[in-house]
């Protein structure tokens, strides 16, 4: 079954919520995207005479017809909170201080009329200048919060927490064992690794990139675990797998999970405990800095495919940092843009 929520779209310009659009929605089962398209075209009355590469199978298509609905999913599917646009001001066309600046976005329904040559040039307005000046912000009040417990004896080791549900109160007991200095050090020294905390049986780990496979060698020194200097494999790296856009385009969840299993094997071979991947942001532009790390412009496809790849990686005992799932679209000047 497919949740009805999967058929919704975010209406950024009118309602500002997730909507069910009026009309027919088609679901099909097929071996690949081409066969899926042919199935739906067949339901619409098309044949190979209309340019299809092969006849589709109308019996494999389910059609659901809806009236326009901007109410049912005006609250978040998972939390029940009101759906609001947090970043409307990032759109020049909706930013109140844009002045005469406008941007024309590409549209598949009017491709020739919306493709504009050259880079978009914007003129600085006074309000834009004022809004981008960094200002001090008041820290939120700590009223109502309790200082955490540190260094409380409990005799729990990290391995005891394997498989314990995230909401289990045993985690509170486990965390209360740690001292302030231990927590400060693990936070301050966490770039592509985590430090050891011997008192709870936590080893030092190597956690490294990336979304297309491991980037480090199985070698001496800082790259991976140490090996014999005469080991003929010491400078070998793991496989670089196809970029995530290509992986998602297969729409083959079983194959994607197998890719994850292979990445997990490579990660163990390179001495990884954790992988800085996968990339969960969505494609907003072909010129974004991390397009190769992300799966799709479709959030549903991104989530479904990534889940299977993550399951594959973690089946080998390698934990996954699902990273860059929001606000990471630009590499140029990335350190200077807030």
Per-range role (PLM):
Residues 1-10, 21-28, 33, 81-338:
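Glycoside hydrolase catalytic-domain context in secreted enzymes
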Residues 3-86:
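Terminal connector regions
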